[in-house]
From Swiss-Prot:
GO CC terms: endoplasmic reticulum; endoplasmic reticulum membrane; fungal-type vacuole membrane; plasma membrane
Function: Possible sulfate transporter.
One Pfam family this sequence matches: Sulfate_transp
Residues of the STAS domain: 532-657
Originating organism: Schizosaccharomyces pombe (strain 972 / ATCC 24843) (Fission yeast)
Membrane topology: Multi-pass membrane protein
Similarity remark: Belongs to the SLC26A/SulP transporter (TC 2.A.53) family.
Name of the protein this chain belongs to: Probable sulfate permease C320.05
UniProt keyword Endoplasmic reticulum present: yes
CDD domains: STAS_SulP_like_sulfate_transporter
Transmembrane annotation, as ranges: 77-97, 102-122, 162-182, 198-218, 240-260, 275-295, 301-321, 336-356, 368-388, 405-425, 433-453, 465-485
InterPro entries linked: SLC26A/SulP_dom, SLC26A/SulP_fam, STAS_dom, STAS_dom_sf
Amino acid sequence: MSSPSENHLLGPKTSFIDNRTSTSRPLHEIPSYQSLARRSSTWKRANIPQQKPSLVRRINYYIPVLHWLPNYSLRNIIWDVLAGCSTACLSVPIALSFAQTFLGVPPIYILTGTAIGPILYCLFTACPLISIGPEAGMCLLIAENIHQRVLSKADVPQETAILVTGLIAFIAGIINLAAGLFRLGFLDALVSPVLLRGCILSISMIIMINQGSVFFGFSGVKYKGSDFPIDKLMFLIRNMSKANIYTTILSCITISLLIGCRNLKSKLSAKYPRIVSIPDAVIILLLGSFLSKKFDWHSNYGIAILGEIKTTILLPKLPLPEKNKLHFITQSLQTGVMCSFLAFIDTVIAVKAISLQTNNLIRSNRELISLGAANIGSSLFCGLPICGGYLRTKCNIMSGARTQVATIACSVLILLATFFIMPVFSTVPTCMLASMVVSLGVSLFADAAVEIFKLARIRVWWELGIIFSIATCTMMFGLETGIIFGLSITVMQIIRHSTRSRIMFRSPTSNGTAEFILEDAASTLSHRTNPSSTAVESAPRILVVRIPEPLFFANVSQLEDRLNRLEKYGHPRMHPGETPYRRIEDIEVVVFDMVGVSSIDSSALFAFQRILKEYVEHQVEVHLVSLDPQVLHIFEKHGLLDLIGGYDHVQDSIKKVDALCDIELGV
């Protein structure tokens, strides 16, 4: 008789046992395996009372600013403002570079969007130290979209480029917001490290190629070919003779200073943490602007400069043209989807990296909602899509940031710099801005190269092949195609892994012993066994099938195929082209250990019924072991128990089958 605790664990799930109408076995002889407490393979469910959160707690959970802002300590204000100043010094030059060298739009739009978006992000995020802004990958996608419109028309006005940038940010924000509301944050599992390395390698190469014309100062020549990176690379190689030597020298000096300062700060940051907050990029640009104005580099040496920067107050509006709105949206939809995906992935990477240091719990759905709000806010000012960046976040933390106020301070300082400091940058050479972008590309390429060398050292050739396939596809057909190609490979890998059966078999080997054979693994039974071997004849003709997972339409078909091969060839992985040397009649007993079958769908149920029926028709004795009560109820309802001989063939453990068959299975 089961104990009260066992009856409590069972609850209403086993009520069918008391009310069953089958006469295959008397009620008092029902086996004890139907008690969840006695099934060693089933986890006991803890009876933990759940407290429903109040309305105020729910509101504070979904809008964290209502919780942290009233509890903000003024002792942190100095550290947050200093950190915001350091991050702003990093964000302003990057925004200028993206606006001028990537998109060709006035910097006022990019800077305003870069300031407004993070403020909205702070209202919803639960990560206090994350810093967000525009990233190179999304700028690259938008630049490709603008260039495709250039190819389809004679020219694209600057107003159109501004609207394209804002609309793509709006689409990305809507998608991120909807994904967060519908709880699709689990999709970050689609991003495998291999896909990430392939995308980083591709983005780094395309960044350096796209900045080549400005970096070398090509004069009198403009690229008008296709949007494929390989064609742009060939254009650069063919026109190297037209490069401005002074522009090239200045670009090389700038990129050397930027990379040198970054490496120096990286080496000294452990000993002097505050060194990270030094705005080296701003200092280099201000120095270049001063020297350019003093020696008149534009007139004397032909070095292009940024020119006058208009600073006007922008009002929020939807980034849509007056005519052909639907066609305009259609042309931007695919790029918007890609940008939303990249924004989410970049943010998750940064948040996870920071969470390891701060022990914060990451909630992907909340980050999606925060990103959606930030990108929608940025798009209303025709700004770029923004996302979390690891470099920017690291600078924020190393500068002493304590709360989300650091991000708000950064946004306020960017707005102040936009309206009061921008005229200082009017004489900055554009090649220096391009050098900043190229230095980011070099940094990404170096990170990807380090990971690739690690994979090559451990000889993971399959993953290396995927990385270089993504990079090759991107170079040949563009970044969007490369990302789609990489995602397709990842999805196929996930599907293959999720549908791969973990079912184990046990049958006599050639030396007369019995061993478990994992369906996926190489086994000692892979060689052909001589059917006349006396060891096989003397071995017990018993097949044990352990199923450690729920049965559904995908893995049950593999179960049928593996059983068929095992019956014919002695091993479930034997090639079907071999000559069969066994028959199903050679098996006397089949034991299905349903240790992990907590559920079964209709397709798997009918397929499993066919398997049992075939064994019964060939007079093979079938036993079921460790059945879950719910699955047992389904089997009884659909006649599977009557098919195998009733409850006498259902046991709670392998030991019971040992006693019934008068053998020792040794499982």
